[in-house]
């Protein structure tokens, strides 16, 4: 492709609203442009990268036995109502009405549509297992779109769905697609980890996220320093043991703590270590109010609270609900004197506290010398806190460290969550009606492009891995007015294309500095500069990733490039 014919508008300045490198560079290099908040156009170079990621995805999905189809972006509300997600999915689901006032949603995901499709066509175990996938635009009304392609309102996604007669069949396909995902991200050149995850609004169990390691990631990964254990911080269980001290219990005492609300403030004011304080929080669990206790130096993990109750929705109670329940403000909450109808659950660590402190459910007061079970009753002690760095790894090997990650893929064992809700059944080999067992597997295709750009860049621009680069080679005649340079550049361009390489020829009448700056910004793997030594049959070859350059004779160029790109 000749650069003079390409629509690739570059920017010299970093856009003010672009916070992270991938967003900045994809805009500056002319790979995309923003149309509205969280909505982008892919320009020609960006589209080439997107298509290469798509191709890798398709190859690995088909190798894993999945078959491609395409479903509609507009989905009837009746399907979402049938599954129970029309209201529970929340405000991220974009809803609309047609001219006849019939309700629809723009597809945020396609479990309902695929389940409806398959239930009408697959009636026997003889047609199972079945794995179908699509690459389709998705829509989510993000409250705060940010980070370019990483959190947008419209994005390209590959979603696959598998249907099974037995759990063993699901396990087999899940493992196969887990490996396919690992192959996809490895072929894209990414540094990633597969981690144990929460299924969230999707439902089901046994789920893994594929996380690209990056400081700008919105998720925290907890991983072992000596084993391959890795989990989303929301899902990492705490296996710590707590020993109760033999300190004698003291008499409960209420003390004034004016204007002291946060644990750190109360701890300092009372000269008590944070690990002897009891942090009390009120959660709304499927409309039921529950008091949750953790140690003062720990944080409540709301996903674990949700899992304790098998709840659909868990959220912090409002100030008004807390005021009505306990007649106090958030900073004074405590478990002592709570109405017996209100359930109190606590993290394991709370049971080991002796002579601790807690809120007194009275503004400006706390209790000291608080002892669980003597001063208040707990209905259940369980794992309710976030794991911390330095904790023992849940697999028993090593200690936990944290890293940030960008989620690019997610695989779920949905089980019968959707098939039972939507009456998607089949006849088993005994002629009995059974619900279809399902799996779900998603990859953020456009998000993967951003993740690659986030991992592969330097101070001068993008540095694309060869598997996804828009072109393999960038040929730059320095002076297009020179017949020797222009002709040699065109000859190299043509010969490399004949060898199967994708080549970009900078045939613009621009200054050398502009051409080189754009070349660095685009980040193609190999740059061939045709300069003053063209008359001698010599060019300069530069490897973008390493910055290494060498003069090469034209007759040796193809072999030299082949060795770089092998």
Swiss-Prot record:
InterPro entries listed in its UniProt record: aa-tRNA-synt_IIb, aa-tRNA-synth_II, aa-tRNA-synth_II/BPL/LPL, Anticodon-bd, Anticodon-bd_dom_sf, Pro-tRNA-ligase_IIa, Pro-tRNA-synth_IIa_bac-type, Pro-tRNA-Synthase_IIa_type1
Keyword terms, alphabetized: Aminoacyl-tRNA synthetase, ATP-binding, Cytoplasm, Ligase, Nucleotide-binding, Protein biosynthesis
E.C. code: 6.1.1.15
Keyword Phosphoprotein (UniProt): no
GO biological process: prolyl-tRNA aminoacylation
Tagged with keyword Flavoprotein: no
Annotated catalysed reactions: tRNA(Pro) + L-proline + ATP = L-prolyl-tRNA(Pro) + AMP + diphosphate
GO CC list: cytosol
Localisation per UniProt entry: Cytoplasm
Primary localization class, coarse: cytoplasm
Matches recorded under CDD domains: ProRS-INS, ProRS_anticodon_short, ProRS_core_prok
GO molecular function, one term: proline-tRNA ligase activity
Family note: Belongs to the class-II aminoacyl-tRNA synthetase family. ProS type 1 subfamily.
Domain notes: Consists of three domains: the N-terminal catalytic domain, the editing domain and the C-terminal anticodon-binding domain.
Subunit structure: Homodimer.
Function field: Catalyzes the attachment of proline to tRNA(Pro) in a two-step reaction: proline is first activated by ATP to form Pro-AMP and then transferred to the acceptor end of tRNA(Pro). As ProRS can inadvertently accommodate and process non-cognate amino acids such as alanine and cysteine, to avoid such errors it has two additional distinct editing activities against alanine. One activity is designated as 'pretransfer' editing and involves the tRNA(Pro)-independent hydrolysis of activated Ala-AMP.
Name of the protein in its database record: Proline--tRNA ligase 1
Organism: Bacillus thuringiensis subsp. konkukian (strain 97-27)
